[in-house]
C-alpha cells in the first residue's frame, strides 16, 4: 500500500510545480528554479513522504553535464535506493507517455510562455456552411466551480499570473488541511477543481495547448501504476533490479483498454405501463448511473487500480486503463459474470453488462488510441449480440426454468416478489424495487450528498433516509446531516466542495442534480400558455 501511495500520489503531484511556477511574479526566481524543484520544495514543507518529494524533484531525465544533475536526476541517487529510483523511473516514463499523447515534441519555431492559456478542444469543429473561427479562443485559468466560457485570447491576456496565483493559493489551502493523509480520490477531486482549466505545458507554436494539467496528472498516475503492476506480475524485482531499461520499453502490450456497456437502458427506464410509472423514471435514470458507478468501484477494487485509471463512466458505459496481465484478464471476466448474475437475480434478462478489453503498447498510447477504441467498440458489439451465452451454457436448466407468475408488479411486470404499498398511493401495490425508485425520485431533489457505507456496516436509517444496495455496496441517501461512518461520499449539488476530512474519499456525482423541479407539474407551471411540456 505504501508503494502504491508513493507511485499514485507522486504521479498526481509530479507537475504541481508548474502551477506554482506560473503563480510566481519574480522573473529572477523563475530563472533560477525549475518547476520540479519548486514542486518538491512545497511537497517537503507540506509533509508528504520523502519518496513522493523525490518523485516530484527527479521525474525528468537530465544530461550528466546539466548543472543540476546531482540535485534533480534520478540516476544521481545511486544503487542504494533502487526501489525509489525505479519508482521515479516509472513515473518519469508515464509522464513521457502522457506528454506524447498530448503534444508535439518541443522544437522548431515554438517558444515558452508561462502565461499561455488552455485552448478549447472544440475549436477546430466547423459547422456545415460556417467559417472556422480565426481568432484564438482560450479558457481563463479558473476553478471548475466558476462559470467559464471560451473567449478571444486578446480579451483575457492581461493579469493571467494573478489568476494562477489565486488558483494556487486556494488549492494549497485545501491541500494543507491534511497533506500526508489525503485520500487518493480526494486529491484527484481537488486537482480537477483547480487544474481543469490550466494548460499542461506552456510551449506555444501556432496553436495553444489544449490538454489540461489535470488530465495530464491523471493520465500519468494511471499509466505509472499499470506499468508497475505489469512489471511486477512478470517477475521483476522492484527492490533489487535496475529497471530503467525494462520500464522504458514501448513495444510490449503492457496495457488494456477496458470497455463496458450496459444494454437494456431505454426499456428499463421508459417501457413502463401504469398510473404510477412516471414517478419511477427519475429514480430509475439515477439508479443506472449509480449502477455504473458501483461496477466501476467493483472493478477498481478487484484490479487494485486508482480512480485515475477511469477514462469515462456515465450514460451506461465505462472505459478504464488496466495492466495487461493474466490476473487482470481473469478478474475482468470474473467481474462481468458476477455483475450479470446479480443483474439476472434483480431484473431477469432486462439488463445485461458487456465487458471487453483490448491490449495496447506504450507507443500506441502515445501515438493515439483511435484504432484501439475502434477494436474495443467492435468487441462490445459482438458481446452485445450474444447476451447471456455464458450463463445459458453454464446453467441451462435454471435459466429456462418456469418462473412464478403471481405477484406481478404493475409497473415493471417482474413477478415472484412480494408486493408492497406504493409510496404515493398505499392501496396500489408494487414490487419493492419500484417502490424504492419512487422514494429515490422523491429524495433526490433534496439530497446534496450521499454516502457509501463501509462494508458490513449496519446503519439504522431515519424515516426520511433511503439505503440502496447495488452490487453489494450500500449507499445512504439522506435529507439531513449525517456524521456516521462512511467509506466515502458523493457530492451532488456542489461537486467539488469537501464536507469531511481529506482522508475520507470524496467523489463528484453531477449526474444526480435534480434541483430545478421536484415534479413535472412544477416545470409545467413555470411555462407560459397551455400547461403542456414542450408547448
Label the predicted regions:
Residues 1-142, 198-204, 250, 270-281:
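Divalent metal-dependent catalytic cores for phosphoryl transfer on phosphate-bearing substrates
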Residues 10, 257-259:
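Structural motif
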Residues 27-29, 317-320:
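Conserved short loop/turn motifs at secondary-structure junctions
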Residues 59, 314-319:
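Short acidic-rich active-site patches of cyclic nucleotide enzymes
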Residues 92, 103-257, 264-313, 321-535:
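Bergerat-fold GHKL/Histidine-kinase-like ATPase
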Amino acid at each position: 500500500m505504501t508503494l502504491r501511495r508513493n507511485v499514485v500520489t507522486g504521479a498526481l503531484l509530479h507537475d504541481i510545480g508548474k502551477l506554482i511556477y506560473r503563480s510566481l511574479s519574480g522573473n529572477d526566481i523563475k530563472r533560477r528554479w525549475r518547476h520540479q524543484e519548486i514542486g518538491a520544495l512545497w511537497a517537503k514543507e507540506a509533509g508528504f513522504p520523502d519518496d513522493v518529494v523525490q518523485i516530484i524533484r527527479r521525474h525528468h531525465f537530465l544530461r550528466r553535464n546539466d548543472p543540476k544533475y546531482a540535485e534533480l536526476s534520478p540516476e544521481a541517487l545511486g544503487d542504494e535506493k533502487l526501489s525509489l529510483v525505479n519508482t521515479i523511473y516509472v513515473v518519469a516514463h508515464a509522464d513521457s507517455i502522457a506528454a506524447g499523447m498530448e503534444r508535439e515534441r518541443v522544437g522548431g519555431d515554438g517558444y515558452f510562455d508561462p502565461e499561455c492559456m488552455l485552448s478549447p478542444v472544440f475549436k477546430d469543429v466547423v459547422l456545415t456552411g460556417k467559417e472556422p473561427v480565426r481568432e484564438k479562443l482560450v479558457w481563463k485559468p479558473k476553478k471548475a466551480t466558476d462559470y467559464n466560457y471560451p473567449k478571444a485570447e486578446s480579451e483575457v491576456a492581461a493579469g493571467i499570473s494573478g489568476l494562477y496565483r489565486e488558483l494556487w493559493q486556494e488549492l494549497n489551502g485545501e491541500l494543507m488541511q491534511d497533506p500526508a493523509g489525503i485520500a487518493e480520490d480526494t486529491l484527484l477531486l481537488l486537482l480537477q477543481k483547480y487544474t481543469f482549466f490550466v494548460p499542461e505545458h506552456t510551449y506555444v507554436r501556432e496553436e495553444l495547448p489544449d490538454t489540461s494539467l489535470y488530465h495530464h496528472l491523471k493520465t500519468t498516475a494511471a499509466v505509472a501504476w499499470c506499468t508497475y503492476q505489469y512489471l511486477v506480475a512478470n517477475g521483476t524485482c522492484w527492490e533489487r533490479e535496475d529497471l530503467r531499461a525494462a520500464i522504458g520499453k514501448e513495444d510490449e502490450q503492457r496495457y488494456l483498454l477496458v470497455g463496458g456497456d450496459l444494454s437494456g437502458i431505454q426499456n428499463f427506464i421508459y417501457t413502463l405501463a401504469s398510473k404510477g410509472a412516471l414517478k419511477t423514471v427519475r429514480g430509475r435514470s439515477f439508479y443506472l448511473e449509480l449502477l455504473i458507478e458501483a461496477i466501476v468501484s467493483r472493478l477498481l477494487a478487484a484490479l487494485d487500480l486508482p480512480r485515475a485509471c477511469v477514462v469515462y463512466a456515465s450514460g451506461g458505459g465505462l472505459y478504464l486503463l488496466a495492466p495487461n496481465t493474466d490476473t487482470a484478464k481473469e478478474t475482468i471476466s470474473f467481474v462481468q459474470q458476477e455483475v450479470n448474475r446479480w443483474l439476472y437475480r434483480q431484473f431477469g434478462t432486462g439488463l445485461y453488462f458487456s465487458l471487453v478489453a483490448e491490449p495496447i503498447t506504450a507507443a500506441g498510447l502515445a501515438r493515439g488510441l483511435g484504432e484501439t477504441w475502434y477494436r474495443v467498440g467492435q468487441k462490445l458489439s459482438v458481446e452485445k449480440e450474444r447476451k447471456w451465452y455464458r450463463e445459458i451454457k453454464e446453467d441451462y436448466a435454471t435459466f429456462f426454468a418456469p418462473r412464478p407468475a403471481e405477484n406481478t408488479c404493475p409497473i415493471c411486470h417482474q413477478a415472484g416478489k412480494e408486493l408492497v404499498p406504493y409510496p404515493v398511493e398505499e392501496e396500489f401495490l408494487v414490487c419493492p424495487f419500484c417502490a424504492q425508485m419512487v422514494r429515490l425520485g422523491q429524495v433526490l431533489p433534496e439530497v446534496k450528498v450521499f454516502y457509501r457505507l463501509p462494508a458490513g456496516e449496519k446503519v439504522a436509517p431515519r424515516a426520511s433516509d433511503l439505503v440502496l444496495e447495488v452490487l453489494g455496496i450500500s449507499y445512504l441517501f439522506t435529507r439531513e446531516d449525517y456524521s456516521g461512518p462512511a467509506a466515502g461520499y458523493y457530492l451532488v449539488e456542489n461537486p467539488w466542495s469537501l464536507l469531511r476530512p481529506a482522508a475520507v474519499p470524496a467523489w463528484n456525482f453531477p449526474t444526480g442534480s435534480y434541483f430545478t423541479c421536484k415534479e413535472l407539474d412544477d416545470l409545467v407551471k413555470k411555462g407560459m400558455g397551455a400547461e403542456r411540456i414542450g408547448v
